[in-house]
Structures are given as C-alpha cells and as structure tokens.
C-alpha cells in the first residue's frame, strides 16, 4: 500500500481489527521509508443487480428502499429490528446469489412477501394489498383465507 505521506510503496501492517459485523477490517500501517503510521479500512465491494421496474426502467438496487418497505408494512407490529434486518439480509443474499445483472422488481416483491409472511401475518397482508393492487374486500378475504390455511 502506498504511503500517503511520502508515496513509498512498502508499508507494514502493525495491527488488524475486524469489526463486529465482519464486513470491514481496520488496519494500522507503518511506512518502511518515513516510519509514519496511518490507518486503512477494507470492505468488500458487492454489486447488487439492477432492478427492472414494471415500466421497463432500470434503477439501482436500494437497501434503504427495502428497509422502508419493511418498516411501513410492520408499523406498530411487534417485530424487532433485528428480525427485520435478518429478513433483509436473507433477501440480499438471495439477490447476490442469483448472479444476475438485472432482476425484475416483481421478484424482489415476492421475496419480501415470503419474508413478511414468516415475520408477521398482518404485515404480510398489508404489503400484499398494495403490492398486488387489491381493489376490494374480496381480495382481502381471499388472502386472509389463504393465510389461515
């Protein structure tokens, strides 16, 4: 690694710490030429597939958008933040494991539905009513009957 002080290319790692989430590493380094110390951070770079909307537009995947969808569906429901985070991690892992450059928004929606159904039935019905564009009480009845089975 190049020293930020003297641009020498040879540095030594003198300390390494893995952060709790195990997604990043902090390293203290010392330059072999000027002996100055500096810190570097390493983090894996993952690329999520682009999301293809119903109208054909392609947008960048958004973790925050997914989290907001979960929070909206689970508003005032007894589900911990940890369980929500775990559900989102499972969805993101599935998206990465697909190995695709693009994924239809409908596929993400179905993954969300599957996770919500496991977390909280009321949240599942809330999300489904918007996602599937319910038009009347019969749509709700059909879904509630399905959930009760």
From Swiss-Prot:
PROSITE patterns in UniProt: ATP_CONE
Zinc fingers classed as unnamed: ranges: 3-34
Stated family: Belongs to the NrdR family.
InterPro entries attached to this UniProt entry: ATP-cone_dom (IPR005144), NrdR-like_N (IPR055173), RNR_NrdR-like (IPR003796)
An example Gene Ontology molecular-function term: ATP binding
Cofactor(s), by name: Zn(2+)
Origin organism lineage: Bacteria, Pseudomonadati, Pseudomonadota, Betaproteobacteria, Burkholderiales
Domain of life the protein comes from: Bacteria
Listed name of the protein: Transcriptional repressor NrdR
């Amino acid at each position: 690694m190049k020293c930020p002080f003297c641009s020498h290319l040879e540095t030594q790692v003198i300390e390494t710490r893995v952060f709790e989430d195990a997604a990043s590493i902090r390293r203290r380094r010392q330059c072999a030429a000027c002996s100055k110390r500096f810190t570097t951070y390493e983090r894996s770079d993952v690329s999520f597939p682009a999301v293809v909307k119903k109208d054909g537009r392609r947008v960048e995947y958004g973790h925050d958008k997914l989290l907001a969808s979960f929070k909206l569906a689970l508003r005032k429901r007894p589900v911990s933040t940890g369980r929500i985070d775990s559900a989102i991690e499972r969805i993101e892992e599935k998206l990465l494991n697909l190995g695709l450059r693009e994924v239809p928004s409908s596929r993400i929606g179905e993954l969300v539905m599957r996770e919500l159904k496991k977390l909280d039935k009321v949240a599942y019905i809330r999300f489904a009513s918007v996602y599937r564009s319910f038009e009347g009480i019969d749509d709700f009845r059909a879904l509630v009957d399905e959930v009760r089975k």
